């Protein structure tokens, strides 16, 4: 899993303790085993992106206090995940007709996905998506770490930060507890 390699590298570079990665991997396998009532698409997303990060947070909590664990997760989410996603978006933004293509694909995905429930408004100049149920939030709550969901939301802000062809803002989120 790509996510596991990123986590292992982060632990090696930042924390210098591979025991954390071994525990994270154990926790991840346990969480995956206990995940129920999800579609195959949800399971794939959970296993590839969401649950490895939740397992890392839980493993960190075994080695550090909760505030320190959260700070380490914040660094991982912002500097590894968010930064890489933002870099990819800035590269894609150079593609001619980027906004047109991206908005069409994004809106199509939002209509058919089972990763979240949303309402979408759009025209040629903008699209507005209101997500009313979110797999990331549900996974954090189901795994007893709702505070971690805020970092998933923050990564969206980082992903779209500084883009010239897409403006992005979050007004309310389940992760911030104001939706």
What label would you give each PLM region?
Residues 1-83, 96:
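N-terminal leader/assembly segments
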Residues 48-54, 58-144:
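Amphipathic interaction/junction segments at domain boundaries or subunit interfaces
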């Amino acid at each position: 899993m790509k996510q596991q390699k990123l986590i292992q590298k982060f632990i090696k570079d930042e924390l210098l303790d591979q025991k954390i990665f071994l525990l994270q991997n154990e926790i991840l396998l346990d969480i995956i085993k206990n995940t129920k009532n999800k579609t195959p698409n949800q399971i794939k997303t959970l296993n590839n992106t969401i649950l490895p990060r939740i397992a890392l947070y839980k493993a960190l909590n075994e080695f550090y206090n909760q505030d320190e664990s959260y700070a380490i997760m914040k660094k991982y989410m912002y500097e590894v995940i968010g930064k890489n996603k933002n870099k990819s978006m800035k590269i894609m933004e150079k593609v001619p007709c980027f906004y047109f293509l991206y908005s069409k694909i994004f809106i199509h995905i939002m209509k058919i996905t089972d990763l979240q429930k949303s309402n979408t408004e759009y025209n040629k100049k903008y699209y507005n998506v209101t997500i009313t149920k979110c797999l990331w939030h549900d996974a954090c709550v189901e795994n007893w770490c709702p505070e971690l969901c805020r970092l998933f939301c923050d990564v969206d802000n980082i992903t779209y930060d500084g883009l010239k062809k897409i403006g992005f803002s979050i007004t309310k989120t389940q992760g911030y507890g104001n939706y």
